[in-house]
Amino acid sequence: MPLSSILPVILIPSLLWMASLHYTLAGLVFLFILPSLFLIAVRVIVKHKPKTKFFYNWSCVTALYLFFIYEVKCVGTFWDLPKLISWWENLALVLGMGGSLASYLKLKWDFGDSKETEGKICRICEIYVKGKDHHCVWLDMCVSTSNINLFMVFLTLTILTSGHLSMMLTSYACPGTLLGPILLPSMCWPEKQTDCLLLVSGVYSGIISTILSLLLIGQACRKLKNI
C-alpha cells in the first residue's frame, strides 16, 4: 500500500486523539501541527510527486472517520447511548451526506467520461481540459467551465453538512443554550475522554466547513466577474 494511503489513516485518528487529551494539545494540533503538515505536504510532496493521492486520501479518510465518530461515539449505533440527537438532526445529516456523495460521484463520472481534444492539458490528469479553472487535489479531478456549477453545488452541500455535524458534535460534548430546536454549544472542556474526542472532531469539522465556505465565496466572486 502506498505511503499516500497509509499516512491519512494513521495521522487523522492520531491527531484528533492527541487533541482530545488536553485543550493545550488541541490548540497545538489545530493551530500548528495541521497547518505545518499541509505546508510541508504542498512544498515537498506536490513538488516532487505531483500525482500524489495524499490529499484525496485525506479527504476520504476524514469523511469516513468523522462519520464513524458520529455514529459510534455520538449516536451509539452499536450500543445504547443517551439519545441526545433528535431524529430530524440525524435525518438532515444523512441527507446532506447523501447529497454530497451524489454530487461528488456525478462530478467524478462526468470527468472520467470527458474526451476533450482541445484546451489546457493538466500535468496531473494528463488530459485536455477545456476552460480549466484549477485541479482540485482534494477530489483528484480538474474543475472547469463544464463542471464548475456542479462543483459549487458539491461545496454548498458539504459546507452545510460539515457545519451541521460540527454543531451536533460540539453541542453534544458541551451543551449550551437552546435556541428554538437547535442546541448551541458552550465554551467548555469535557471531563470524559469520549466527549473530548467528540468536541475536537466537531471543531475539525467546523474548520473544514469554514475553509470550504471561503473557497465557495471565491468561486462565486470569480463567476460573477465573468458574467
Predicted regions and their residues:
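Hydrophobic alpha-helical transmembrane segments that serve as membrane anchors
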Residues: 1-114, 145-227
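Short metal-coordination and nucleic-acid-contact micro-motifs, chiefly zinc-binding Cys/His arrays
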Residues: 118, 132
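Cys/His-rich microdomains that often coordinate metals
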Residues: 129, 143
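Short amphipathic alpha-helical segments embedded in low-complexity Lys/Glu-rich regions
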Residues: 139-141
